[in-house]
Amino acid sequence: MRHRNSGVKLGRTSSHRKAMFQNLANSLFEHELIKTTVPKAKELRRVAEPLITLAKNDTVANRRLAFARTRSAATVGKLFTVLGPRYKERNGGYLRVLKAGFRAGDAAPMAYVELVDREVNTSAE
């Protein structure tokens, strides 16, 4: 029986999964838009959204928890100085997953993961 077993394995060991989602979350918080496969994007929400919720309350304990989960001082700094205040009034739903077709090599379904309410650079002007 698989009762209470949530999360997808994605064909990886638990340590590989943990490292992969840590790296994906760090990239997402740094760039605010990343492209990945749809299953990874959907699972990334379960990792990244609680970190933003944590960043809404800036305490030393919360900063230490965020660092324990990301292992990146730059990410923690951005979470608590930029992203936490940005989403102070929003109750969840900080990420948007947009389908982006299929990858050329193996036809894997791809998706963009972006932070809602991010500043979009319009450098085409």
Swiss-Prot record:
UniProt-listed InterPro entries: Ribosomal_bL17, Ribosomal_bL17_CS, Ribosomal_bL17_sf
Alphabetical keyword list: Ribonucleoprotein, Ribosomal protein
Report the GO terms under cellular component: cytosolic large ribosomal subunit
Listed GO biological process terms: translation
What GO molecular function annotation could you give as one example from this UniProt entry? structural constituent of ribosome
Q: Domain of life of the organism in this record? A: Bacteria
Question: NCBIfam families from the entry?
Answer: L17
Q: How does it assemble?
A: Part of the 50S ribosomal subunit. Contacts protein L32.
- Which family does the entry's similarity section mention? Belongs to the bacterial ribosomal protein bL17 family.
Protein name listed in UniProt: Large ribosomal subunit protein bL17
Per the record, the gene is rplQ
